[in-house]
Amino acid sequence: MNNLKRIKVIAGNWKMYKDKNEALEFIQKVNFSIPNSKEVETIIFAQSTLLDVLVQNQGPNLKIGAQNAFHESEGAFTGEISPLNLVSLGVKYVLLGHSERRVLFGETDQLVNLKLLKALQNNLSPVLCLGETLETKENNKTKEFLEKQLTQALKDVPQEDLEKILIAYEPVWAIGTGKTASPQEANQTIKQIREKVTNLYSAQVVQSLKILYGGSVSSNNVEAILEQNEIDGVLVGKASLETKDFLNFTQAAVKLSSNCCQHFDKKC
């Protein structure tokens, strides 16, 4: 399957970095340098305490996402983040199933599924994170592991809602370690993920499904990653904290898009 019709996505996960002033400074610097959303889709996932001010100051080509949401819209759940309230702030995207949530907070595939269903119910676009550990990789169980994660996370998700979902493949062994899957290896794994979703739904609906790669993405390897046929974008961690690096990622996506247009004699 080719991805020529799918706009590339550059997503930055700020994790628990930046205070209000630092976040505003970043947004003000990048707002008018981010490429048109028709060329590349650009998202920043920030701490919940920053979401309101970032949404109020985001430029026309930048979207703000949350890093987590609860599996109920409201109620007596002290400290949790309501998906309903995220929408009221103007947030469009939410990260779900990130490996740090799974490892540090014990989130299971079943819990990720509940969060995914509630996010969709509240008209949020979830970015579903999947990824295997080093042990799983070394035991040659990556395909089976990811298929299980995927099947459980997408349980009871109707086909018509699949278009709202993005998937991010983030091998746990590559997150924040400086290690990364080779572009070809990442491409092959993402192809397998796409094939599994095809089996769960249909080939037609999967044509528009965007699957990102994350795991020690940097300015040095982003072009090689984005060039891969099955990879629709990147989810970047700490490397997205600097304005120069973040804009470099977006420009790499635009450059690739322009090259594809020229190669196939299409208008960009």
Swiss-Prot record:
Keyword line: Cytoplasm, Gluconeogenesis, Glycolysis, Isomerase
A Pfam family: TIM
EC primary class: isomerase
Active-site residues per Swiss-Prot or TrEMBL entry: H98 (electrophile), E170 (proton acceptor)
UniProt keyword Cytoplasm, yes or no: yes
Cellular compartments annotated: Cytoplasm
Keyword Transcription among UniProt keywords: no
Stated role: Involved in the gluconeogenesis. Catalyzes stereospecifically the conversion of dihydroxyacetone phosphate (DHAP) to D-glyceraldehyde-3-phosphate (G3P).
Protein name listed in UniProt: Triosephosphate isomerase
Organism: Phytoplasma australiense
